[in-house]
Amino acid sequence: MAKKVKKTDDISKKFGEDRRKALDDALKNIEKDFGKGAVMRLGERAEQKVQVMSSGSLALDIALGAGGYPKGRIIEIYGPESSGKTTVALHAVAQAQKEGGIAAFIDAEHALDPAYAAALGVNIDELLLSQPDSGEQGLEIAGKLIDSGAVDLVVIDSVAALVPRAEIDGDIGDSHVGLQARMMSQAMRKLSASINKTKTIAIFINQLREKVGVMFGNPETTPGGRALKFYASVRLDVRGNTQIKGTGDQKDSSIGKETKIKVVKNKVAPPFKVAEVEIMYGEGISRTGELIKIASDLDVIQKAGAWFSYNGEKIGQGSENAKKFLADHPEIFDEIDHKVRVKVGLLEDEVLDNNQETVELPETDEFILDLDDAIEIED
């Protein structure tokens, strides 16, 4: 019986060696025909962790799970009109430029406001802009920019405005059933591999439509067919919520709106998380506002009554004064932002340690003590 087992083991070993040799020969032939790296073992990849670029919003980075938009992937941002879709995309453009990258904006809607983009931090002198005449032209331009490997971010605004050439050349009222969906399906097939290879982030902004005759379930859908839904690694649903009223002379005016960004699809982290941000008119997402809220929830910033404190020092009475303080002191903003990202697991605590001194809060006249602790000043 022992001899039979040994013989069987020898046969299995020889069979395994033959399979290994056949696999090695196949890999050599594939490499010869299609180039090095056409097939590789997953553990041999230099970068196994998904690389990300910050969205430009701390709350959205946390909701995305990975700390930002994954590089080499397709992102879809959709929502109702005036919900803040383009604002979210422009913050990504500003962040890409801040990190030294090159961004392109395909303005199919022909509605980009350069002044507003600049207010959000976009360097409009360096931003590549295209306003195509047709959907095919816009997608071809995006494809050539991606294929170059020199562009870090491409934004297409919007899918609904990518009108096929046949529809433009035809008459109003002509039927073009499924034409845009076929165009988008072909574009996704062509662009997806190039996007992944060049590590370009492609953001598609989309609008909402309603299905006719839907009695049960959600009647909302996005134009352009289903291809974009399948190819997108991340899908964001942007919805404007309540209006933000001003203070003082602007107490009766709306100065912004609270916005919820829901991650409805996420291939790199758990989905269905929600980021709540304040979009201020003319300014974009209030980065100081979201930082104060999140840092207070994590006890990085302490709140007692109306006062906000950091490192034992008061930084402002009321959220507006605290926002102003952080806006005036970017080094303290960056320090708090880093601590928050470490606490939520987006960063490792490799910058701030026991041997490194934290930023000292400046002494200014605007930060006074409570009335009980007030100091009487003699004449």
Curated annotation (Swiss-Prot):
GO molecular function, a single term = single-stranded DNA binding
Q: Keywords, A to Z?
A: ATP-binding, Cytoplasm, DNA damage, DNA recombination, DNA repair, DNA-binding, Nucleotide-binding, SOS response
UniProt keyword DNA repair present: yes
Single Gene Ontology BP annotation: DNA recombination
Q: Which residues bind ATP?
A: 79-86
Q: Which GO terms describe its cellular component?
A: cytosol
Main localization of the protein described in the UniProt heading = cytoplasm
Locations listed in the record? Cytoplasm
- CDD domains linked to this entry: RecA
SUPFAM superfamilies, sorted: P-loop containing nucleoside triphosphate hydrolases, RecA protein, C-terminal domain
InterPro entries per UniProt: AAA+_ATPase, DNA_recomb/repair_RecA, DNA_recomb/repair_RecA_CS, P-loop_NTPase, RecA-like_C, RecA-like_N, RecA_ATP-bd, RecA_C_sf
Q: Report the superkingdom from the record.
A: Bacteria
Which family is annotated?
Belongs to the RecA family.
The job of this chain, per UniProt, is described as: Can catalyze the hydrolysis of ATP in the presence of single-stranded DNA, the ATP-dependent uptake of single-stranded DNA by duplex DNA, and the ATP-dependent hybridization of homologous single-stranded DNAs. It interacts with LexA causing its activation and leading to its autocatalytic cleavage.
What is the designated name of this protein? Protein RecA
